[in-house]
Amino acid sequence: MTYIERTTRYFFLMLLYNLVLLSPMMPDKLIRVLSCTGLMLFYLYCHIKPVNTSCKEQRLKILHGGYELVLASIVTFLIETAIYLFLIFKTTTPARLLIMNGIICAILLYLLFMNGIIRIFTCSGQLGFFKRIALLLFWWIPGFNLFLLHSFMEVSRKEYDFSMEKQQFYEKWKEEELCKTKYPILMVHGIFFRDWKNFNYWGRIPDELIRHGATIFYSNHQSSASVEQCAEEIKACILKIVKDTGCGKVNIIAHSKGGLDSRYAVSCLGMDGYVASITTINTPHYGCNYVCRILDRISPEFVKFIGKKYESLFTLLGDENPDFLSGLRDLTDRECARLNGVMTDAPGVYCQSTGSQMGSAKSAMFPLNLGYLIIRILGGGKNDGLVSTSSMVWGNDLGVLKPKGKQGISHGDVIDLTRKNIEGFDVMGFYTDLIHKLKERGY
């Protein structure tokens, strides 16, 4: 909304708020009735359609409308406060008129404000659980409620601006089909997750790639099992894709342990003829030394107990034969050294890797914040909360992602696990660029 549009809207809202005070200046009853009717219709229009926007997503339209309504209520409240201070101390306006006008104004402002807050509360994808709970529980605390209000406003504004940038980028490049690669994309998840329909491991990334022309498949392998077992499942997935589509090959995008699983499928299970490229993201190619130390210090009975509980849960969630301990052991530096000894890179497969790092323990929530500290304490250096950056390098090194600011990018952020926009890092743009470069290489 432009400055002129906002100013015009605020002007007519102020006329409505002070209609009781302005009525004596309108001796003609018909003029008063028409003015009241017109301003009330305008007020209702503001509630229903608070902003005109070119945004194509209905949720974002509602969200941005909420931002504009809250902003309008704040600005007009401040103006109204200044007007009342002037009327009380500098004029002889009857108290009865001031009180009546004030009550009507307060009701109208409250309704405008609440409409805006409800829109933001229900439609923002970036607010998060804790901010919503904080508002519900602590809205009445002076000072803190203003802090929450400012946070709500900032989050909603940035979310809308970010989404509009994505929309404009797509409209500019949609004819180019930036991600329409020669071979389809096979996305391979990491450990302790599955490819669920109702919760995509890769967040908003697949939809963005598809918008730019990509063809996406998912590996659908076990959430936790040995590298060998997961690789067998990935092999079966690749062969099925090739058979069903006739594509000949696939481009693998693998995160975390999925990178090890994919490498094994290509190097040891004969999939080099069916894979054009492998891109690993935050994969522990040389293992996680802290996993080995932790397993050596924890009671085997306790590890088995946790494993049984995990396997029971994930069997219910879709795994056919999960193996908690085997999956975990293959992340140790000892096992990765063994695997690297047998996983010889296939000459016909383009291999590249990239990673990310957290700025501090505050960059992510549990358990990544704890993992970050453990890795640092044990001498692992810079890491993403699970994997040291030195362990992420394999093949053509694309480097470590380092956005501006102190937050950094965690093991979950790099796959958009929390769907949070990170200042200085466009996760969807990162993958779009990654796939586009594969397209340019002829893959």
Identify the function of each model-found stretch.
Residues C179-K180, G270-G273, M343-P347:
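Extracellular/periplasmic catalytic domains that process cell-envelope and extracellular macromolecules
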Residues M1-N198:
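Flexible, membrane-associating and regulatory peripheral segments of lipid-active enzymes
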Residues T2-Y10, V20-I31, H189, I216, ...:
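Serine-dependent carboxylesterase/thioesterase catalytic core
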Residues R32, I99-A106, F130-L137, D345-Y443:
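C-terminal catalytic-base region of ester-bond hydrolases, centering on the histidine
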Residues E177-K249:
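Active-site catalytic motif of lipid deacylating hydrolases and related acyltransferases
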Residues F192-F193, S223-S224, K257-G259, P284-Y286, ...:
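Solvent-exposed loop/turn segments at secondary-structure junctions
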